[in-house]
Amino acid sequence: MRLKEWLVGVVPEERLARLSSRFHVIGDIAILYLDPELNGYKDEIASALLDQCRNVRTVFNKITPLEGERRTSRLELLAGEGNSVTVHLEFGFRYHMDVARVFFNSRLGYERMRVAVQVKAGEEALVLFAGVGPFAIPPAARGARVVALEKSLEACGWLAENARENGVAERIAVINADAFSMAALLKRRFDRAIVPAPYGMDRIVDALPGMLRRGGIIHFYTFKKAQQIEGLKKSYEDLGLEVLLCRRCGNVAPNVSRWAFDMEKI
């Protein structure tokens, strides 16, 4: 979206250079990441966004990085209705949530569908760091039996509501628990594990082979520099995993990208 183009002549050129053209749209809410040097132009920026994005009713500015177990940021209302509860539509699925209180990344929609279309009816799938359900609900809709672990009690509530909303409540077991407790809680093995790991949670991959049947598939997400990837592949192979696919799926910081790994337990 061409946010900078909308503000030419409104925000001075030297300040406009500090504006990121990227922002999240979740349902009818837009979330910006404004440089402090743009504080004097918040109203103009938010108004331009509301004018150009007819589906957006509320604009927030993220004023802290992700923090706490809920992986949420403090949000500052810039314009609009001020309601942080919304419904996000993605490939025919509806996700209810409060963006001020739960984590959701609207830019992973393609990845969620890429993974979901690989799921076969009758599979047993484990989803860790499940959030409000975007990685759990599509596999259930394809006929999988899903166990979804999420540490945030509030996110679990939204996940259960979203499972009902999307007609898959009978195929999803929602468990409010730390992902690292999975082996103790779930004394069973799965056909597939879907793990959109938060930053700094890479050690979870060590426990995944023990949760899978032979031939089971892991979809794992991590944050790395490109030069780290070959070493990472070797470490996964040492765990008894064959890397089937490795792809970059978004930049998150200078020289740091989100990487998707599809791996098979051999």
Predicted regions and their residues:
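SAM-dependent transferase fold signal centered on methyltransferase-like domains
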Residues: 1-266
